[in-house]
């Protein structure tokens, strides 16, 4: 079953806005069985098939929509030409895509959204479709907002996370791109200095500043609907403070990956290091797969060494389990990740690195066809291996 949306026309409302979908709501789509019982018993459709009409003299160049709870691969196409895939993210967010030249035609056009790839059940919400007659970057760079976040105790700028919500409480897009002091995603900007000039489309926003669980939040409501693009950006100072006394303790993330080295996720190494500071982590462990990566040189180069101490580790990724190990001496040889038993793997880890911490990761997940804590390999009642193996780790994740 395919959901046929209401017909719309492209109407030039201004240089920037081109059209809005008449159905101002979110549609519930599902392929397969209901994912969780928190979703309605019946979805509205398993896919989206939307016809819209455009004028040859006013062709849209980009469009946006809102999505919620996307976990699997959903592909957007216009006139059977793939535009892109929905970000796999459960948050409610506004997503933008540019429309490549030659995709649209004068008259009727068709936008489709279908789940592709592995057909795993996935309930999602999609809607508030809008078209624009400028590029995404142009649309999201019409206005600027100056933000400075300081530590209330020191009165100095502080690393933090900025969350930008639109008037519906949805993560809003910005025209910002990641720099050597910022890491940018939909509705979120991490800053290592506390200082950011936001680029946004005209509208009403709520901007939150925080720095992980130990710090307070501050926020400001901003209306840039009618502000002139030629005037100086309005400036909003925000201040946060440490609220949890953690004397004698350290905030540690023992499982840190980067796209740069692990080839999954989407954070480059510089982006990841900025987010570590922005979340108040004080002891991050580098655990890229079967690699010993020293983050310290780039941490120092980015001026982040006053906020945390990076530790070399490794997610030793084997057929019979994934093990985060640390600390690892700089230059230490890699453990043998091709070994087939926990005893051999533990011995290789000790021989090559001497790591004192070994964490067995996600033992109930399937990787390479093997689940370390499946009933065939692990007795839940006794806590012992069905294979007679000794537990090799000092902790589990």
Please describe what each predicted stretch is.
Residues 9-18:
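Bacterial N-terminal signal peptides
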Residues 91-97, 182-194:
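Aromatic sugar-binding surface patches on proteins
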Residues 23-149:
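Beta-strand-rich recognition domains
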Residues 1-9:
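Bacterial N-terminal signal peptides that target proteins for export
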Residues 115-117, 151-153, 211-213:
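Surface-exposed loop/turn motifs at beta-strand-loop junctions within extracellular Ig-like
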Residues 28-30, 130-151, 226-252:
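Low-complexity, Pro/Ser/Thr- and charge-rich linker/hinge segments at domain boundaries
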Residues 158-165, 169, 187-397:
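Extended, charged catalytic domains and RNA/DNA-binding interfaces, predominantly
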Residues 153-181:
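Short, ordered, surface-exposed loop/turn motifs in non-cytosolic proteins
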């Amino acid at each position: 079953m395919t959901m046929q949306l209401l017909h719309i026309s492209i109407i030039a409302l201004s240089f920037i806005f081109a059209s809005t979908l008449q159905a101002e709501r979110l549609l519930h789509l599902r392929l397969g069985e209901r994912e969780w019982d928190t979703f309605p018993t019946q979805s509205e459709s398993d896919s989206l098939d939307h016809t819209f009409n455009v004028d040859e003299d006013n062709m849209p160049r980009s469009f946006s929509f809102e999505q919620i709870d996307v976990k699997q691969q959903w592909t957007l196409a216009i006139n059977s030409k793939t535009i892109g895939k929905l970000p796999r993210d459960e948050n409610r967010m506004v997503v933008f895509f540019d429309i490549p030249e030659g995709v649209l035609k004068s008259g009727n056009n068709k936008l489709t959204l279908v789940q592709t790839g592995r057909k795993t059940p996935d309930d999602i919400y999609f809607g508030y479709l809008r078209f624009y007659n400028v590029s995404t970057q142009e649309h999201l760079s019409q206005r600027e907002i100056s933000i400075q976040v300081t530590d209330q105790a020191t009165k100095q700028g502080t690393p933090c996370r900025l969350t930008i919500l639109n008037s519906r409480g949805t993560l809003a897009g910005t025209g910002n791109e990641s720099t050597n002091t910022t890491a940018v995603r939909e509705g979120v900007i991490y800053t290592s200095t506390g200082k950011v000039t936001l680029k946004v489309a005209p509208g009403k926003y709520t901007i939150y500043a925080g720095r992980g669980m130990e710090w307070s939040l501050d926020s400001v409501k901003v209306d840039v609907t009618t502000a002139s693009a030629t005037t100086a950006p309005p400036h909003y100072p925000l201040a946060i403070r440490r609220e949890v006394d953690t004397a004698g303790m350290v905030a540690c993330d023992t499982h840190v990956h980067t796209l740069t080295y692990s080839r999954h996720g989407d954070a480059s190494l510089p982006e990841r290091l900025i987010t570590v500071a922005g979340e108040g982590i004080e002891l991050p462990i580098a655990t890229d797969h079967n690699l010993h990566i020293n983050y310290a040189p780039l941490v120092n180069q980015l001026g982040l060494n006053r906020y945390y101490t990076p530790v070399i580790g490794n997610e030793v990724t084997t057929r019979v389990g994934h093990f985060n190990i640390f600390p690892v001496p700089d230059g230490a040889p890699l453990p043998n990740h091709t070994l087939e038993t926990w005893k051999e793997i533990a011995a290789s880890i000790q021989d090559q690195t001497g790591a004192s911490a070994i964490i067995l990761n996600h033992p109930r997940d399937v990787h390479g066809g093997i689940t370390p804590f499946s009933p065939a390999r692990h007795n839940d009642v006794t806590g012992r291996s069905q294979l007679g193996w000794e537990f090799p780790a000092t902790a589990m994740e």
